[in-house]
Amino acid sequence: MGQNPKRLLKRAEFLAVRRGEKRRGRFFLVEVLDRGDGGVPRVGYTVTKKVGNAVVRNRVRRRLKEAVRVHAADDMVPGNDYVIVGRDDALRAPFGQLKAELSRRFRGTR
């Protein structure tokens, strides 16, 4: 099992990842930036106001965080930063499907 990713916390870190590759999924968008240092992967979560009120956005964020923690962190590439932009469908998706989709996007496969 790989080590758990660290969190992206600062606005500048989130903006830097926007320059990287974008991998679109049905339930979310994953933005990926290779830092080039081979260190522990870092991940940040964003859910826009288009998704719903604060309660709904936090539920989407919590589901994505748990999917990464339980399963998808093993598929993250060391030295990469990831920003996961949650979509409305992430709230209604079966958890197994959400985990599988995250793993595919982290590996860069369709």
From Swiss-Prot:
GO terms for biological process: tRNA 5'-leader removal. Consists of a catalytic RNA component (M1 or rnpB) and a protein subunit. SUPFAM superfamilies: Ribosomal protein S5 domain 2-like (SSF54211). Its EC number is 3.1.26.5. It is an enzyme of class 3 (hydrolase). It catalyses: Endonucleolytic cleavage of RNA, removing 5'-extranucleotides from tRNA precursor. GO terms for molecular function: 3'-tRNA processing endoribonuclease activity; ribonuclease P activity; tRNA binding. This is Ribonuclease P protein component. It holds the Pfam family Ribonuclease_P. The lineage of its organism: Bacteria, Pseudomonadati, Pseudomonadota, Alphaproteobacteria, Hyphomicrobiales. Belongs to the RnpA family. One of its GO terms (cellular component) is ribonuclease P complex. Keywords: Endonuclease, Hydrolase, Nuclease, RNA-binding, tRNA processing.
